Design a protein with these regions (language model features):
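Hydrophobic mid-bilayer segments of alpha-helices in multi-pass membrane transport proteins
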Residues: 18-22, 54-69, 84-93, 120-127, ...
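Long, contiguous bundles of hydrophobic transmembrane helices that form the permeation core
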Residues: 1-13, 22, 311-504, 617-722
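Conserved, well-structured core domains of diverse proteins
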Residues: 1-108, 118-122, 323, 702, ...
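Membrane-interfacial loop-to-helix junctions in multi-pass transporters
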Residues: 115-119, 182-195, 222-234, 266-272, ...
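Hydrophobic transmembrane alpha-helices
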Residues: 202-205, 240-241, 282-287, 512, ...
C-alpha cells in the first residue's frame, strides 16, 4: 500500500494501524468542526467539547506520529516500519499530549517551568524537526534551524551590531516555543487544525469521487480541438483543480499525467509541455477559494474576512489565467500547431452559444429562487431552514445524478490513450454535474450564508461523502438495474479511502505549520523582521521599486522547496512587515491584504524557479524533459504572474478594494487586455513576430492600461507641497487629505535620521491640530520648526513612531506637508 509520495510500503499489520490512525484523525477533525460535541454534552452531560488549544495539541500529535510511521528515515526501511519509528511516533505524540493532560498544572505555573516541562519541550522540538525532515526534507528544517540558532546566539559578538539582540535563555526559549501559544502551538497550527484540514479533506474526497478526472475531460472537450488544445485544456483543468487542491506538485501530477503527453503529441517540446503544466498548476495555488490551503492563514494574519479575501484574490487569479491561456495560444501559433481531431461533428456555433447562455441564466435563476426561498423561510420559520437546505441538496443531487446516469461513467475515459479524439462538450458535461453540487454547497455556505470557513467545509464534506457513498449504486438503479448493495459497499470503501487520503495529505501541512510557528515565535521574540527591514532598506538605497524587487527576490528564495502553507508563513512573517514599514517611510500606504498577497505570489512562484522548483521536477518526470530547462521555461511563462503583485501594490483596485461592481467589471476587462498585451510582448509575437520597438510599445500600452494614473501624475502631481507653519496655523479648519513627513533621530542609532510618512484625512469642520492630537500626533509649533512629541500608548501611531528617539538633543520634526491635488 503506497501511502503517499516518498512514503513507505508497510506490512499488513502495521498498515492497518497506520490507516486506522489516519481515519481516527479525520473523524476527530470532523467531530470538532461540527455541533456534535455540544449536542452530546447537552444530552449526556459529559464534557466532550475540545477548545482550540486542545484541538491543536491533538492535531499535532496525529501529524507527528503519522510522519514517523509513514515516511522512512532510510531507504532500507521502505517496506516496513522498524520498532525505532514506533517509539519515535509514541514520544512525539506524547510530547503534544503532555500539554493536554497537564493543562491545569501548566497554566498554574505560567512562565515558571518545572524540569518535566523543559524536558518535554526540548524533546518535542527535536521530534518535530525529525518529523519535518521525514515528511518534507531539508529546506524548511534548515530555515527553522537558522531561526532557532538566532534565538540562542543572537547576542554573540561575531554578528554585526545591527543583527544582535539580547538573546534568550534555554528555559525562556523552550517555554516560548512549546508551552504557550506564540510558538509551535500558535496561530498557524490553529488555522491548520480548524480550517485547512477540512478543506484538504474536501479536496481528497472530490478527487476520490472522480471530480479531478471529470474536470480534465470537460476542459479537454471544450478546448482540445483548438490550436494547442491540450495545453489550453491543461490551463483550465489546473485552474479547476486549484479550487480544491492544496499543492502545485499534486496538481501537476494529477492533471499533467493526461495533458503533458497530449501536448507533446500535438507538437510541444517536452520542456514546453512540462512548463505549461507547471505554470498552470502554480497559478492554481493562487486561485480562490482554497489558494493552496493558505487562504485561511492570509485571512487570519491580515484580519480580513475569508469572504473578502476571496473577492480580493479572484480578479488577479483570473487575469493571470487569461494571460497564460493567451501565451499558450501564441506558442501554438508560432509553432504552427493544430488541435486534436473531434470524435464527431460539432454542434452549430449558434446552438452551442444559445445552450451556454440558457444554462447560465437557468443556473442564475435557480440560485436566485433558492436564495429568496431561504430568506423567506428564515423570516417565517427559521427552524425549518436547515430542512429546506437538505431538500434542495437532495433534489439537485438526484437531478444531476439522473442526467449522469444517461451517459457513460467518467471512469470510462481514464487514460491518455482515451483522449486521442475530442468528444463534444455536451456529452461530457452531464457525466459529472453531480460533482459540482458539493462545491456549490461549500461556496453557498461561505458566500451566501456567510458561515465560517470551518462550518462551510464541514457541510461541503458531508455533501461530497454523500456523493461518494451513493453515486455508483444510484446511477445503476436509475439505469433500470436492480439496486446493488455491493456498489453501496464500494462507495463506503471509497469514502473511507478518501478520508484516509485526506489525513495523509495533511501530515506534511500539519508538521509544516507547526514548524512555521517557530519562525513566527522567533520574529515575535527577537524582532528579526526589523533586521531584515534594515538590510533591505540599506540595499535598496531608499528606492521604493528597488525595495519591492528585493522583497520579491527574497520571497522567491525563502519559498524554494516549501509547501504552500509553510511557504506563505515564512515569507509573510519576514517580508510583509518590511513592505509595510519601508513603504510607510516612502509614503506608500497599501492595505495589509495587498502586502500579504504580494509576498504570497512570489513565494508560490518558487515552485517553478530553478534550481529547486519542485513542480518543474514533477512535470519533467512526466514529460521526460530536462527539469532545469522546464523550470526556466515555466518561469518565463509566469513572468506575467510576477508582474501582477507590483501592479496591485500601486493600484489596489485590481484587488476590488472599495470599487462598485460596474467599476469591477471595467477593471477586469482592462486588466485582462493589458495582461494579453504583456503576454504578447514577452513572447515576441502578436499576429506576427514583433520588432523590438513593437515589443516596447506593447509594454507601454499594457502598463498604461493598468496604471493610467502614472502618466497623469507626471503632468499633474498628486500632492501639492504646503508651507508647514502657514497650513497648520492659518488654516486650522482645512478639510482634505494631508501627507505629513516626520524626520528625527533613530531610536537605535541617534546619529542616524529616520523618516516616517503619515497619510491622514481631516474631516470637514474639524480643527487640524485637534484632529491630529486625537490620532496621537501632538505637534509643537515654534518660530522655525514644527516638532512632534512622543505619542501616548494606545493611540494610532504609537507603535509606528517608536522608531524615533523623542528625548535626544535633536527633535522629531515635521519636515514636509502636502495636500492631495
Amino acid at each position: 500500500m503506497r501511502i503517499e509520495h516518498h512514503s513507505r510500503l508497510t506490512q499488513s499489520a502495521a498498515r492497518r494501524v497506520v490507516l486506522g490512525l489516519c481515519l481516527v484523525w479525520t473523524l476527530f477533525q470532523i467531530y470538532t468542526a461540527s455541533a456534535i460535541p455540544f449536542v452530546l454534552s447537552d444530552w449526556f452531560g459529559l464534557n466532550i467539547v475540545f477548545n482550540n488549544q486542545e484541538v491543536r495539541q491533538i492535531h499535532l500529535a496525529f501529524a507527528m506520529a503519522l510522519a514517523m510511521l509513514i515516511h522512512p528515515l532510510r531507504a532500507a526501511d521502505h517496506s516496513s516500519i522498524p520498532w525505532v519509528d514506533w517509539i519515535a511516533a509514541t514520544i512525539a505524540a506524547g510530547c503534544c499530549l503532555y500539554l493536554l493532560v497537564f493543562k491545569d498544572q501548566i497554566s498554574g505555573r505560567s512562565g515558571l517551568p518545572v524540569t518535566a516541562d523543559l524536558w518535554v519541550s526540548g524533546i518535542g522540538l527535536l521530534m518535530l524537526g525529525l518529523a519535518l525532515f521525514r515528511a518534507l526534507g531539508l529546506p524548511l528544517l534548515v530555515v527553522s534551524s537558522i531561526f532557532l540558532l538566532y534565538v540562542f546566539f543572537g547576542d554573540q559578538p561575531f554578528l554585526p551590531d545591527s543583527m544582535q539582540w539580547k538573546g534568550a535563555s534555554l528555559n525562556k526559549a523552550l517555554w516560548h516555543f512549546w508551552m504557550q501559544t506564540e510558538g509551535v502551538f500558535g496561530v498557524a497550527l490553529g488555522v491548520a487544525s480548524s480550517m485547512i484540514f477540512l478543506f484538504v479533506l474536501f479536496g481528497a474526497l472530490l478527487e476520490r469521487a472522480g471530480a479531478g478526472l471529470y474536470f480534465i475531460q470537460l476542459a479537454y472537450s471544450l478546448l482540445g480541438h483548438m490550436r494547442g488544445g491540450p495545453a489550453k485544456a491543461a490551463v483550465v483543468a489546473s485552474g479547476l483543480s486549484g479550487i480544491y487542491s492544496g499543492s502545485s506538485i499534486a496538481n501537476v501530477v494529477s492533471t499533467g499525467t493526461f495533458t503533458i503527453p497530449l501536448m507533446k503529441q500535438t507538437g510541444f517540446t517536452a520542456e514546453k509541455a512540462g512548463a505549461v503544466e507547471v505554470a498552470a498548476s502554480t497559478n492554481g495555488q493562487l486561485t480562490p477559494p482554497v489558494m493552496g490551503a493558505a487562504a485561511f492563514l492570509i485571512a487570519e494574519f491580515t484580519g480580513v474576512s475569508y469572504t473578502d479575501l476571496i473577492r480580493h484574490a479572484l480578479l488577479p487569479a483570473l487575469v493571470s489565467y487569461i494571460g497564460l491561456m493567451y501565451i499558450v495560444h501564441l506558442e501554438a501559433v508560432k509553432l504552427g500547431l493544430q488541435g486534436m481531431p473531434r470524435s464527431s461533428r460539432a454542434l452549430p456555433w449558434l446552438q452551442r452559444y444559445t445552450s451556454l447562455l440558457a444554462g447560465f441564466f437557468g443556473v442564475a435563476l435557480l440560485g436566485g429562487l433558492i436564495h429568496l426561498s431561504f430568506g423567506w423561510i428564515k423570516g417565517v420559520a427559521p427552524e425549518f431552514s436547515i430542512w429546506l437546505g437538505l431538500l434542495v441538496f437532495v433534489a439537485l443531487y438526484v437531478f444531476t445524478l439522473l442526467l449522469a446516469s444517461r451517459h457513460p461513467d467518467v471512469e470510462t475515459l481514464d487514460s491518455p490513450e482515451s483522449f486521442q479524439t475530442v468528444m463534444p462538450a455536451h456529452e461530457i458535461l452531464p457525466r459529472g454535474l453531480h460533482f459540482l453540487v458539493p462545491i456549490a454547497v461549500l461556496l453557498w455556505c461561505i458566500l451566501i450564508e456567510r458561515l465560517s470557513p470551518t462550518l462551510s467545509a464541514f457541510w461541503g464534506t458531508l455533501a461530497i461523502l454523500t456523493v461518494i457513498l451513493t453515486q455508483s449504486a444510484l446511477k445503476q438503479w436509475f439505469r433500470g438495474h436492480a439496486f446493488q448493495w455491493a456498489l453501496l459497499r464500494r462507495g463506503w470503501d471509497q469514502a473511507i479511502s478518501g478520508m484516509i487520503q485526506g489525513a495523509q495529505n495533511m501530515v506534511g501541512i500539519g508538521v509544516a505549520t507547526a514548524v512555521a510557528g517557530i519562525i513566527i515565535g522567533t520574529v515575535s521574540l527577537t524582532g528579526a523582521h526589523q533586521v531584515i527591514g534594515e538590510l533591505v532598506e540599506a540595499l535598496s538605497g531608499g528606492s521604493l521599486i528597488a525595495m519591492l524587487v528585493l522583497v520579491a527576490l527574497m520571497s522567491l528564495i525563502l519559498g524554494m522547496g516549501l509547501p504552500t502553507t509553510a511557504n506563505y508563513i515564512v515569507v509573510s512573517s519576514l517580508m510583509a512587515p518590511v513592505i509595510v514599514s519601508l513603504g510607510a517611510q516612502s509614503g506608500l500606504f497599501v492595505p495589509l491584504v495587498a502586502v500579504h498577497l504580494f509576498v504570497f505570489y512570489f513565494g508560490i512562484l518558487a515552485d517553478d524557479t530553478p534550481p529547486v522548483g519542485l513542480a518543474a521536477f514533477a512535470a519533467s518526470a512526466i514529460s521526460q524533459g530536462d527539469p532545469i530547462r522546464t523550470g526556466i521555461q515555466g518561469f518565463t511563462y509566469d513572468i506575467r504572474t510576477a508582474i501582477l503583485p507590483f501592479l496591485f501594490i500601486f493600484n489596489t483596485e485590481l484587488l476590488l478594494i472599495d470599487v462598485t461592481w460596474v467599476k469591477g467589471v471595467t477593471i477586469f476587462v482592462v486588466a485582462a487586455a493589458a495582461m494579453m498585451l504583456f503576454a504578447a510582448a514577452t513572447q515576441g509575437f502578436w499576429l506576427t513576430r514583433l520588432r523590438l520597438w513593437e515589443t516596447g510599445a506593447l509594454l507601454v500600452i499594457a502598463f498604461t492600461l493598468v496604471r493610467p494614473g502614472y502618466w497623469i501624475d507626471q503632468i499633474q502631481p498628486p500632492w501639492l507641497p504646503q508651507s508647514i507653519n502657514e497650513t497648520v496655523l492659518t488654516e486650522p479648519t482645512y478639510a482634505g487629505t494631508l501627507q505629513l513627513v516626520f524626520e528625527g533621530p533613530d531610536f537605535d542609532d541617534i546619529d542616524r535620521d529616520v523618516r516616517y510618512v503619515v497619510l491622514t484625512t481631516i474631516p470637514e469642520g474639524t480643527d487640524v491640530t485637534t484632529f491630529l492630537e486625537s490620532q496621537g500626533l501632538i505637534v509643537q509649533v515654534d518660530a522655525e520648526t514644527v516638532s512632534l512629541e512622543e505619542p501616548f500608548p494606545g493611540t494610532n501611531y504609537f507603535q509606528d513612531l517608536q522608531r524615533f528617539d523623542f528625548y535626544g538633543d535633536r527633535p522629531v520634526a515635521l519636515t514636509a506637508l502636502s495636500v492631495r491635488n
